[in-house]
């Protein structure tokens, strides 16, 4: 039978029978897939480490009726540092669940995979504030999934910048302070948060974390990013409550 060779990030692992696992894997060519990993729970298995949560591995897959079967796997990267703090692990689980919820199935998901790998690397190596990583993932993921906010200017008067702005969380348009006041909308972004919002949603992938933001602006950006993402999800994320308990 023909096999498929692909890189993939393990997003979930579920024990099945005595020594098997069912894996949920995010791949660049096939999107999110389910795969059976026979005997992968046996400690003597050469493939034991390749199947772990947040392991980025090369998989040799055999297509089946309902799911793939993993024939071989070799580890590329294990994000050990993710579990070095409860806050980091909580964030990783939240990003993981959002990726499973929003990434396509049966089609290309290279952008989604690169973003998640980048964020896990940033968490693992403590390269950025966890709230920055969270906001970047939420906003960029929403943008890639068809919910890119209308960030060019005020939706009414066309003003590009000001000391504050309002982002409509449902429709994704901006209002300047004057237009927001006329409609009774309280501004939820300051200038720094708006700059970061535009940067995250519009810049090329490799520069996505190349911005600076003040503590005050980050608080506004973080709140808007979270609310915007949760507004457009089909269902609540189970990991959200735990994340908020460790990273308010």
Model-derived segments and spans:
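Non-catalytic alpha-helical scaffolds and adjoining flexible linkers that form interface surfaces
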Residues: 1-248
